[in-house]
Curated annotation (Swiss-Prot):
UniProt subcellular location: Cell inner membrane
Primary residence: membrane
Native source species: Vibrio atlanticus (strain LGP32) (Vibrio splendidus (strain Mel32))
UniProt gene name: ftsB
Transmembrane segments: 4-21
Protein name per its UniProtKB record: Cell division protein FtsB
Length: 93
């Protein structure tokens, strides 16, 4: 009976070691779970960026206001008949 109890104790110890420290054990589970959470955060940021880009694309397709705004700010263009004024602040000496 003692030998049987000893064998059971050894098997139980081996199973516990495998569960906690072995391949696909608890430690691997927590590591993969952390990686999943990090990747979900990255995916959420990319999803928001994509949504902004799609909104900008839709705006460019549907309206001339966005195109006009980009031409004014990025290219420095003005409409025909408009006068461009640049206001420069005073420099402190």
């Amino acid at each position: 009976m003692r030998i049987f109890a000893l064998v059971l104790l050894i098997v139980f110890g081996w199973l516990q070691h495998t569960l906690w420290l072995g391949k696909n054990g608890i430690s691997d589970y927590y590591g993969v779970n952390n990686e999943i959470q990090v990747q979900q955060q990255v995916n959420e940021k990319l999803h928001l960026r994509n949504a902004e880009m799609f909104a900008e694309i839709d705006d460019l397709r549907q309206g001339l206001d966005a195109i006009e705004e980009r031409a004014r700010h990025e290219l420095g263009m003005v409409k025909e008949g408009e006068t461009f004024f640049r206001i420069i602040g005073e420099e402190s000496h």
